[in-house]
Every structure is written in structure tokens, then in C-alpha cells.
């Protein structure tokens, strides 16, 4: 069995494709569940289907476990922790918005601005929309059939902002970085500046519309989950937190996911981060693998371990399962 004493408070394990990374992570999970109990160790992977396959392998190995999903996803870990915190505090429990509910909120926000135009009472966001569309009669661009295209862009914008952790307090910094190259501002970067200036107030209006639509509930987008969970980490009691989190395919974590892991690390949760930057497949959704691996070492003080290829050799059922997803 793996010796957990060989791990630091944060350990970053890097291995080539098919070198046995997932099997290494599973071995660590089995050892941690033996030491800490089934509730205090968890493994996060990049997708639900992989989680189910690996979770079944763990359950077969241990015969019985106290948590239904010993292998899950990082958002599920965040949701579980936030639910525990809010339940103890007597607050409404988190519930994710589905796609239809999100569409209703987005269209409500856009309809408010078309209403401003119709009444001749344009607001600051209306002015930004006019600049964004570069036409005087911009309201037609977010109404009727045209609304579908812009609503889709709006939805994607919300997700990308949340995934990179673009908080309101970073607005001025992000706009400045997007707009300038040295002391010059070209047309492309000016366009980026306009987009960022519009994105922040629209997201603020969207968040307020969610609160107005569900005044007695705590509703949030799936992409917003990691941000809110990070804020809740400081409120968590020790029993709400695992002793060890193992993250397989760490290269596919979002920046918001990294912030969540950093907050847990600051609370004393041990981290085992396993992956390979060259195997990233989620860069289009806010994953920056090279940055993640550098930041794990510089910000968390993670010790780098390079996995030897011979670790993949294993005749066990667990090893066979891991080899298919490593």
C-alpha cells in the first residue's frame, strides 16, 4: 500500500501518457481512505463518466465505503462542501440553475435594456451596448431572432469569466491589460477593452436578476460554483473538509478551480495533484496547464515528483481500469 507519509502538504506528480498516473492517484486514494476513513479522502477527476468507472473500482477494492462517490469531480467536491457550510448555518442550500432557467434570466436582462431604448431612458450599459454593436439602433440586435445569437454569447461570456476567476475587483486591471500593448492601443485591443467594459456590468445585472427571481433561494450557475465555494472555505469547519484531495488530470482544472484548491490548502487540506500539461484538453474552458503547474509549485509550495513509466505495470483490476483512463 502507498505510504502517505511520502507526500508533502502539496505534491505535484507529473508523468508521461500511459505512465500510470491514474493508478498512482487511485493507490493514494485507497491508502488515504484506510488511514482517514471513507469520508475524509476524495479523488477528483475531469468528468462524471470517468468518476463512475474509477469509483466502482474503489468500491470493489474496499468492499464498502461510507461515501457514495469516493471518486467525483472538483465542482462536486465544491458543491458538497458548500452545502455542508450553508446547512450548518441555516442558510438556503445551493441549487444550480439549469439551462432553461439561465436563458430566462439572460433574456430578462436584455429586455430591460431594449425597454430603456423604447422609453428614451438609456443607461450606462445601454451606451456600452451601442458602442459594442457600433450602430445607433442597437436594440434590434438583442431583440427577436437576433437575441438568440447574442444570448448565446452572453451565456458563454458568463461561463468564461467565472472559469478564469474574473472577479469585479479585477475589472480595471483586466481592461487595462486587454487594451494596451506598451503605450499603444490598436483596433483589436480597443475592441477587447469595449467587450470587457460591457461584460462586467452585464454580469452584475445578471447576478442581481438571479437574486430577484429566486429571493428565498441560493441559485447559481455551474460555472459560478467554484468562485462561491472558494469564498465559503473559510467558513467551513474542520469536519466539512477532507484530509486529502487527489486531483487527477490536474492540467484540466480551471483557474477558479485552482483558487478553490489553494483555499483548501490554506485550511490545511493536503493536496495530491496528478497530471501532465501536454495532455490538457480543456484549454478552451479556462484551463491554463503550464500556469497551473508553475503556480502549484510557486504559490502552494508543491513538491514536484516525476512518475516513472514502470509504475503503470499492474495486473490488478484497479490497474486495468486506471490504465484505460490514465
What do these predicted regions represent?
Residues 69, 244-247, 272:
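Hydrophobic "anchor" residues on beta-strands that sit immediately upstream
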Residues 1-17, 24, 130-246, 257:
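Accessory N-terminal region flanking or inserted into the helicase ATPase core
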Residues 31-41:
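Post-Walker A helix-loop "phosphate-sensing" segment adjacent to the P-loop in P-loop NTPases
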Residues 258-326:
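Conserved RecA-like helicase ATPase core segment
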Residues 246-253, 277-278:
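Conserved Walker B
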Residues 36, 239-241, 263-268:
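Short, conserved loop/helix-junction motifs that constitute active-site signature segments
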Residues 40-159, 294:
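Conserved P-loop NTPase-based nucleic-acid remodeling module centered on helicase motor cores
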Residues 2-7, 11-33, 301-303, 308-326:
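Helicase P-loop NTPase motor core
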Amino acid at each position: 500500500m502507498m505510504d502517505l507519509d511520502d507526500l508533502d502538504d502539496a505534491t505535484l506528480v507529473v508523468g508521461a501518457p500511459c505512465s500510470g498516473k491514474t493508478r498512482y492517484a487511485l493507490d493514494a486514494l485507497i491508502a488515504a481512505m484506510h488511514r482517514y476513513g471513507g469520508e475524509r479522502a476524495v479523488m477528483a477527476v475531469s468528468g462524471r463518466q470517468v468518476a463512475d468507472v474509477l469509483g466502482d473500482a474503489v468500491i470493489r477494492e474496499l468492499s464498502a465505503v461510507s461515501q457514495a462517490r469516493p471518486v467525483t469531480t472538483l465542482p462536486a467536491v465544491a458543491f458538497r462542501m458548500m452545502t455542508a457550510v450553508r446547512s450548518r448555518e441555516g442558510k438556503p442550500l445551493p441549487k444550480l440553475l439549469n439551462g432553461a432557467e439561465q436563458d430566462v434570466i439572460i433574456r430578462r436582462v436584455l429586455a430591460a435594456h431594449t425597454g430603456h431604448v423604447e422609453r428614451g431612458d438609456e443607461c450606462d450599459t445601454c451606451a456600452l451596448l451601442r458602442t459594442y454593436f457600433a450602430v445607433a439602433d442597437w436594440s434590434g440586435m438583442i431583440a427577436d431572432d437576433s437575441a438568440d445569437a447574442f444570448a448565446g454569447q452572453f451565456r458563454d461570456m458568463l461561463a468564461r469569466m467565472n472559469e478564469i476567476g474574473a472577479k469585479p475587483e479585477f475589472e480595471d486591471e483586466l481592461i487595462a491589460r486587454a487594451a494596451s500593448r506598451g503605450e499603444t492601443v490598436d483596433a483589436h485591443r480597443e475592441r477587447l477593452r469595449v467587450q470587457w467594459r460591457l461584460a462586467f456590468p452585464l454580469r452584475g445585472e445578471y447576478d442581481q436578476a438571479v437574486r430577484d427571481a429566486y429571493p428565498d433561494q441560493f441559485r447559481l450557475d455551474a460555472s459560478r460554483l467554484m468562485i462561491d465555494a472558494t469564498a465559503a472555505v473559510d467558513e467551513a469547519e474542520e469536519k466539512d473538509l477532507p484530509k486529502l484531495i487527489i486531483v487527477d488530470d490536474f492540467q484540466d482544472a480551471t483557474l477558479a478551480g485552482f483558487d478553490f484548491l489553494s483555499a483548501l490548502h490554506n485550511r490545511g487540506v493536503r493536496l495530491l495533484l496528478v497530471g501532465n500539461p501536454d495532455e490538457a484538453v480543456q484549454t478552451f474552458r479556462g484551463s491554463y496547464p503550464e500556469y497551473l503547474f508553475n503556480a502549484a509549485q510557486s504559490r502552494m509550495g508543491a513538491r514536484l515528483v516525476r512518475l516513472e513509466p514502470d509504475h503503470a505495470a499492474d495486473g490488478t483490476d484497479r490497474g486495468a481500469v486506471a490504465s484505460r483512463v490514465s
